[in-house]
Amino acid sequence: MSSSAECRPIGWGGWGPDPNTSPTRAAIKWFADPRSLHHQQCACGLWNARRAMQWVIPAPPRIWIDDQPRMVKLAYILGAVTVFLTSGNAADVSPTSSVAASTTPSAADSLSSLGLSLPAGNVLVGNNETFTASSPYYEPLIDEAWSGNCRLNASCIVTPKSAQEVSLVIQVLSILDTKFSIRSGGHSSSPGFSSIGSNGVLVALERLNTLSISADRKTLTVGPGNRWEAVYQYLEQYNLTVLGGREPVVGVGGFVLGGGLSLFYNTNGLAIDTVTRFQVVTPNGTIVNATPTEHADLYKGLKGGLNNFGIIVEYDLTTNTGIDVWFEVKNYTRAETPALLAAYATYLQNADVRSNVEIQANPAYTVVLYGYLDHVSAPSAFNAFSTVPSVSTVYPPTNASLNEVLLEIGTAGVTGSSWTYTVSFSFKVTNPDFLQESYKTYLEAAASLLPSGVLLEYVPQGIIPNLVTKGQAQNGGNLLGLEATPQVWGEIFAQFPATVSQSTVASAVNDLLAKITSSAESQGVHLPYIFANDAGPDQQVLRGYGEDNLKYIATVAERYDPKGVMQKLQNDAYFVSKEL
């Protein structure tokens, strides 16, 4: 996909004029996650590739093959899938059940009966047509990955449409010792985490797009193949919402498993804490419902354990009736940003739990969203910021519905073919000092990278104690090991052209992270938590939860995946086996 030559990346994944020349217009994207998919429409006339895909790609095909000469034998093993689907479904039972035990030999025997001897990495499962790289299906599916450096050419792509098909896929990949990667929406900056190259199979979950609401309208069942845009649109008819992505085109799966900061995260807590049921396909093919009372150990493990246990094929999320919001968006100059951060520190000490302030800084200016969960006029919650002069108003004070805000303003921008890299860190906020210091350190690094075409952004996401205590009180709590104190979950986000090496950017960003971390430790404000949704590929997310929680995740992973399929065959992730 290509973007207009006039478009340049700005904060929160948006696009617009060069931020050095027009901060007001460039701030068209104010609150979205700082990584939005390139499948959107912008003022430059780019088409919505995601929507086009809904009719360009027909439902039946499930397999795409990149290297046709090397992978041509795949067509001859496809008959194996019918044995599983006709001999019985993997049931919702324990991993040691007779059903689970019987499904694996069936798939293995079927492959053996074909008389084929294929090397690991040269095998894919499925029951429909296969396509070469020249087909119209393969490249659009690869381009679903949001960041350019994550658009790896997998040997094959599988798009299962049911838990039973996912069960078969994971069994055969395991039997054949084939590397794989799992993709929900592909909104990652880490190559290999939801993508894979010619050494393996991409399991794309986009057809797992269930959306249904319970009779009492308190629970939404959602498949990981959905993007938040579809979820919000579905819920509009019920005047409800859920804790979902600030950018509507982000996929459901990775957002929820990573924790998930919604627009009013300090009011409602993390998305992961609103999950009442995970439907999981474990590596032996068993389909398990994990709830607070059923497979409770797995349920608890998934409240922070990411994709160490299996493939999540369905989520039950608690719905929310609080959809009336007030918001305003302003731009501030670089010179005023230290004063703005001082006001932010004051605000975080005693924030109104119905309010939200989101800040994103780039080298030229800083954009701020002020939001309040109700229809109000000039809420006093933001008085701390009243003395800091803004340079312009992007969106004037407005009352709207939360879904309207997310669907309309949240899709106002577009990203192109930029590559990205992110890291995450956290620190306590007791006064403005470290917030201002971290911003100054960031500016120095950003200035050194800008001449080479690298745009570095700093997103200090302020967290108040209510987010932590809300999570501890919901559905048995989580494993994140959070401290109930005012804090910041900082993100350093880099966008850069493919002409700049990722290793160069990663080295510079990691050096910046090391400086910020070292200074935070010396000042006694460092926190070990690393927010998974913003973390870098080399960070140890699970270790940041604390030793006890890390060991618990390892125990659950061993129980549900004794052969270590998710640790050994999954292409890349925050593996518990690497962090012990």
UniProtKB/Swiss-Prot annotation:
Residues 150-322 form the FAD-binding PCMH-type domain. InterPro entries: FAD-bd_PCMH, FAD-bd_PCMH-like_sf, FAD-bd_PCMH_sub2, FAD-linked_Oxidoreductase, Oxid_FAD_bind_N. The modification Pros-8alpha-FAD histidine is found at H187. One of its GO terms (biological process) is terpenoid biosynthetic process. PROSITE patterns: FAD_PCMH (PS51387). One of its GO terms (molecular function) is FAD binding. Yanuthone D is an antibiotic against C.albicans, methicillin-resistant S.aureus (MRSA), and vancomycin-resistant Enterococcus. Pathway: Secondary metabolite biosynthesis; terpenoid biosynthesis. It comes from the Eukaryota. FAD-dependent monooxygenase; part of the gene cluster that mediates the biosynthesis of yanuthone D, a fungal isoprenoid epoxycyclohexenone that acts as an antibiotic against fungi and bacteria. The first step of the pathway is the synthesis of 6-methylsalicylic acid (6-MSA) by the polyketide synthase yanA. 6-MSA is then converted to m-cresol by the decarboxylase yanB. The cytochrome P450 monooxygenase yanC then catalyzes the oxidation of m-cresol to toluquinol. This is FAD-dependent monooxygenase yanF. It comes from Aspergillus niger (strain ATCC 1015 / CBS 113.46 / FGSC A1144 / LSHB Ac4 / NCTC 3858a / NRRL 328 / USDA 3528.7). The gene is yanF.
